[in-house]
């Protein structure tokens, strides 16, 4: 996937990606945080998903912290430093996985395992 800088360049974008990273990978290793951010930007670049960070994150049924309200809470207070740094790096072009999906690893899906997640 080719990430277009015009799609991801704003401060709001960084804060939004950082909040999702904290919600989905707050207790994961830093590589896991980078991978979650990579999935978001890979989706933005894919024709199968909305073409904006906000569109991808708020797409119905995709990220459970959005549905539960946890994402809104983290976004309002600001993500932790590690998640914010990971978001900055991913937006800057450090895409660490070429995947569109991830989930908690229960051993049933083949993919790249990082921490407690599998990326596929």
Question: What residue spans do the PLM features occupy?
Answer:
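Bacterial extracytoplasmic/cell-wall-associated proteins, especially those involved in peptidoglycan
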Residues: 10, 14-120
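Single conserved hydrophobic/aromatic residue that forms the stacking wall/gate
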Residues: 1-13
């Amino acid at each position: 996937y080719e990430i277009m800088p015009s799609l991801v360049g704003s401060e709001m974008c960084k804060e939004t990606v950082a909040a999702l990273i904290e919600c989905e990978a707050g207790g994961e290793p830093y590589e896991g945080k980078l991978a979650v951010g990579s999935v978001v930007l890979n989706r933005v670049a894919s024709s199968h998903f909305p073409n904006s960070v906000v569109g991808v994150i708020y797409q119905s049924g995709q990220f459970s912290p959005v549905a539960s309200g946890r994402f809104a809470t983290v976004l309002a207070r600001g993500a932790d430093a590690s998640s914010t740094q990971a978001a900055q790096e991913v937006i800057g072009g450090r895409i660490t996985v070429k995947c569109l999906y991830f989930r908690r690893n229960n051993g049933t899906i083949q993919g790249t395992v990082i921490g407690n997640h599998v990326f596929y």
